[in-house]
UniProtKB/Swiss-Prot annotation:
Keywords: Cell inner membrane, Cell membrane, Ion transport, Membrane, Potassium, Potassium transport, Transmembrane, Transmembrane helix, Transport
Gene responsible for this protein: kdpF
Phenotypic consequence of gene deletion: Inactivation of kdpF still leads to a functional KdpABC complex in vivo. Deletion impairs ATPase activity of the complex in vitro.
Protein role: Part of the high-affinity ATP-driven potassium transport (or Kdp) system, which catalyzes the hydrolysis of ATP coupled with the electrogenic transport of potassium into the cytoplasm. This subunit may be involved in stabilization of the complex.
Pfam families per UniProt: Potass_KdpF (PF09604)
Record-level Gene Ontology MF annotations: P-type potassium transmembrane transporter activity
Protein name: Potassium-transporting ATPase KdpF subunit
NCBIfam families, per the entry: potass_kdpF, PRK14748.1
Source organism superkingdom: Bacteria
């Protein structure tokens, strides 16, 4: 795997994690 592919996968996981985190915070409020 190239560095670009690894970077892209990491960015996707970061975005998904951020969305889930935002949804949980919205539910808390």
């Amino acid at each position: 795997m190239s560095a670009g592919v690894i970077t892209g996968v990491l960015l996707v996981f970061l975005l998904l994690g951020y969305l889930v985190y935002a949804l949980i915070n919205a539910e808390a409020f």
